[in-house]
Amino acid sequence: MITKIKIHGYRIYKDLTLEPNPKLNLIVGANESGKSTLMEAIGLALTGRINGRTASEELNPYWFNSELIEEFVRQRTSGNPVAWPVIRIELFLENRDELQKLCGAINTDLPTNACPGISMTVLPDPAYSEDLDEWAKNASPLLPVE
């Protein structure tokens, strides 16, 4: 059972923390409100796949939250050497015996929460730091991910 979902920087979600009801959850909302994106993020964290392909094959600039990219570009063009945008999806799981292999305290909860869970992080490859720095000098709204 998932006890908490945290999504940072993925598509529509700049920062989302959701604690599902242990019995029943209905996801409703207007078109383009993030219902499918929420389910996609959960599946991505659980399997590392999206649309039947690995995350690395499917990664594209539209995965990154546009507000975070805009803020990053604004800060960089102002001369502030801010960190590159990242995507982080965390699934906190019920503390049960069969899930203890997934137990750890490497999550963003403060104070530290030692519990079973799964996380996925998408961040720039340091091997391409020169290319990314060059892009940042004249940045476009889409983060290069090729």
Question: Which residues fall in each region the model found?
Answer:
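Glycine-rich phosphate-binding loops of NTPases
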Residues: N60-V86, F92-E146
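Pre-Walker A-like glycine/lysine-rich segment at the N-terminus of P-loop NTPase domains
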Residues: M1-G48, S56-L68
